[in-house]
């Protein structure tokens, strides 16, 4: 994880505007960062959500087009499902733009304990069990990651003591 903080005044390129992308965008905007959002094939729903959030949803037609748009970017955040061979990564590498993940951002913004569970099979089951065990023991926990709740959203709940995160390999590979 990089130690540089994304905060007010930072310009961030976010690639992928699904559930996690929208949550990361909201978290960045809340922290007064400028966000450039990209998606290869946005739906009408995504376009409407982006408009409501006050961000432009860009469709990069080429590596060259993307490089022009990211010339003033401080950081880049790919969403978990973006393939490693996508030209987004090569553009960021060429421009020497640090790539952060949702987990990196969450760790920068929140210091509460995170129990991250990974593996080939059984992640959801184990996460659910750990979450229930924590609740039964009186600890307020949140279930996040590959679930319906991105970690950047879960950290917004101040009552939560511990984050239980389902972290599959595509989330940890960056």
Language model: regions and residue ranges:
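N-terminal leader/targeting and accessory segments in enzymes
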Residues: 1-101, 105
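Phosphate-binding loop of NTP-binding sites
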Residues: 67-71, 80-174
């Amino acid at each position: 994880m990089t130690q540089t903080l994304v905060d007010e005044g930072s310009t961030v390129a976010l690639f992928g505007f699904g559930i996690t992308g929208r949550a990361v965008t909201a978290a960045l905007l809340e922290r007064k960062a400028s966000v450039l959002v990209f998606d290869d094939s946005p739906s009408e729903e995504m376009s409407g959500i982006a408009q409501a959030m006050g961000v432009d949803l860009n469709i990069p037609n080429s590596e060259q087009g993307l490089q022009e748009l990211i010339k003033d970017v401080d950081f880049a955040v790919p969403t978990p499902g973006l393939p490693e061979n996508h030209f987004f990564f090569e553009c960021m590498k060429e421009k020497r733009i640090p790539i952060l993940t949702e987990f990196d951002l969450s760790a920068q913004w929140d210091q509460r304990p995170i129990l991250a569970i990974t593996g080939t099979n059984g992640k959801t089951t184990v996460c659910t069990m750990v979450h229930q065990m924590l609740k039964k023991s009186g600890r307020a926990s949140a279930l996040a990651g590959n679930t319906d709740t991105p970690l950047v959203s879960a950290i917004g709940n101040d009552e939560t003591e511990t984050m239980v995160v389902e972290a599959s390999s595509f989330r940890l590979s960056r």
